[in-house]
Amino acid sequence: MRLARFIIVGAAALVLMGCNRLTSEGLPEGVLYQDDLDADTGNWILESDMDANARFAEGQLQLEITSPNLIAWAELREREFGDFVLEVDATQLGGPDDNSYGIIFRVKNPSAYYSFDISGDGYYAVRRRDEADGGSWTRITEDWLQSSAIHQGASINKIKIVAQGSHFAFYVNNEQIAEADDDTYRSGAIGLNAGSFHEPGVKVGFDNLIITKPE
């Protein structure tokens, strides 16, 4: 069960890694951005402090949460996406199964974005964070529903979002598990996130990110 509330890692914790500007030059037709996440290209803003660490290691972008009730993320630098299809492989590397990891998208600032998260014990949630209400959470789908599509424990899960206008579809391991409509945010940045609840020690690795145009 999801009982705890997250504390968000603040903007003061941001560590800017490199200054390379993103470009779509050389990408296949229809591909907006692609990154195997094997090494730091300078395209990501990484959060790092005593409570959370984001780094490139072992051929992945890894997020480690060392405090309870906290979420942290790595954000793609200098790019906004409105309509897109995003796919990424996420692997639980350590810590309790009562965790959270996934994608934040259409990010306006640290207090305004959508999130699609799954957990190591087989749940998922789609939520919106609202700056106007002090960073409160709004459920886009029913909060933390169980799905047999999610591989539990120390496993790899392929996470996918299709965003077209105000309509979203959410997939895990090639199975659609939810869809929703919301028009609060029309475009914004994207990020990869991980979070803890009562127990710290959550560690997640991300691989093989690709963002394409919807068909």
List the predicted regions and their residue ranges.
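C-terminal motif of bacterial Sec signal peptides marking the signal peptidase cleavage site
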Residues: 16-18
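Extracellular carbohydrate-recognition regions
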Residues: 22-48
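Extracellular beta-strand elements of beta-rich domains used
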Residues: 37, 207-211
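Carbohydrate-binding surfaces in secreted/extracellular proteins
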Residues: 37, 88, 152-180
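Short carbohydrate-recognition loop motifs
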Residues: 52-72, 193
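Secretory/extracellular carbohydrate-interaction modules
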Residues: 66-134
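Short, aromatic/His-centered strand-loop micro-motif at the edge of beta-sheets
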Residues: 134-158
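Flexible glycan-contacting loops in extracellular carbohydrate-active proteins
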Residues: 180-205
